[in-house]
Amino acid sequence: MRYLLTNDDGIYARGLSALYSELSKDADCLIVAPEVERSAVGHAITLNRPLMVRRTKKDGNFLGYAVSGTPADCVKIGIKELSEKPVDLVVSGINIGANVGINVIYSGTVSAATEGAILGVPSMAISLGTLRNADYTFAAHFARTMARFIMKYFEKKSVALNINVPALPVQDIKGYAVTRQGKARLIESFDRRVDPRERLYYWLAGETQLSEQEEPDSDGSALSRGMISITPIYHDMTRYDALDGLKALLSKETSLLPVAKCDFQD
């Protein structure tokens, strides 16, 4: 069985190493990851330059392939070119910091899992809910458990799961919850600075905050209660409940471009 492992924190990230150590107990794992940190690049892919790929080593042994592109690039090239056998599962992580709510859109970690599902491979993204002093031990163990679960029920299916593990002692984790993506978002602030040559620059800062309208079945809410959140995600971004209303409103307008009416139905 072949697992493709990637992340957005870079090929030498501790979270990826912990993931490999645990998942390699069950499967032949191939690491294909960005050569440097590519956090918050979303689902970007590289079109304007070639992807450079190099074999990397750790302690004298082959570690994996470092790619000059994004996490989504890594999944594409890993599945299509670098794996000499079919990939059965894509696992992205372990990310340092939670990926919940609207911030999922920005996440390279989650986008890597989404890309795997687009390519027809079951996938999961796993993140740890802390930005400092991360202990990946339990998150890696849970990733192994979920990998077994996915291979049992979703083998060869285009499914993607976004998993967030609270950064708590194991005994304090209050179980898991199947959740939906919530409304938590980054509350932006900018750190304004001036360099030695008097040039102005900014660092994007801020922190993720739960929305006042956050429902108890959301990913961010579960994580805040000390639970593991497991969210099925999908790349179709259509808002289906708005289709009929939009059609009705547009049908009333006469000032739009003079094109033939079409309801896009067969």
From Swiss-Prot:
User: Please, which domain of life does this record's source organism belong to?
Assistant: Bacteria
Keywords linked to the UniProt accession: Cytoplasm, Hydrolase, Metal-binding, Nucleotide-binding
What are the names of the required cofactors?
Answer: a divalent metal cation
Which reactions fall under this protein's catalytic activity?
A: a ribonucleoside 5'-phosphate + H2O = a ribonucleoside + phosphate
**Name of one Pfam family that matches:** SurE
What note does UniProt attach to the cofactor annotation?
Binds 1 divalent metal cation per subunit.
Which principal EC class is assigned to this enzyme? Answer: hydrolase
Tell me which residues bind a divalent metal cation.
8-9, 39, 95
Keyword Hydrolase set for record = yes
- InterPro entries named in the record: SurE, SurE-like_Pase/nucleotidase, SurE-like_sf
Claim: Hydrolase is one of the keywords in the record: yes
Gene3D superfamilies with a match to the protein in the record: Survival protein SurE-like phosphatase/nucleotidase (3.40.1210.10)
| GO molecular function ontology, one term from the record | 3'-nucleotidase activity
- Any one cellular component term from GO for this entry? cytoplasm
Q: What is its EC number?
A: 3.1.3.5
**Location(s), subcellular:** Cytoplasm
Query: For this UniProt entry, what is the primary localization, expressed as one broad class?
Result: cytoplasm
Instruction: Please describe what this protein does.
Output: Nucleotidase that shows phosphatase activity on nucleoside 5'-monophosphates.
Q: Which family does it belong to?
A: Belongs to the SurE nucleotidase family.
Q: What is this protein called?
A: 5'-nucleotidase SurE
